[in-house]
Amino acid sequence: FRGHAKGDKKNQKK
């Protein structure tokens, strides 16, 4: 995750 608990659901690139 990018380290965000608010947009980690859509930012699972890492």
From Swiss-Prot:
Molecular function GO labels: rRNA binding
Gene: rpsS
Signal peptide span: none
Chain's role: Protein S19 forms a complex with S13 that binds strongly to the 16S ribosomal RNA.
Top-rank lineage group of the source organism: Bacteria
GO cellular component, one term: ribosome
Keyword list, A-Z: Ribonucleoprotein, Ribosomal protein, RNA-binding, rRNA-binding
SS bond partners: none
Record carries keyword S-adenosyl-L-methionine: no
Family: Belongs to the universal ribosomal protein uS19 family.
Name of the featured protein: Small ribosomal subunit protein uS19
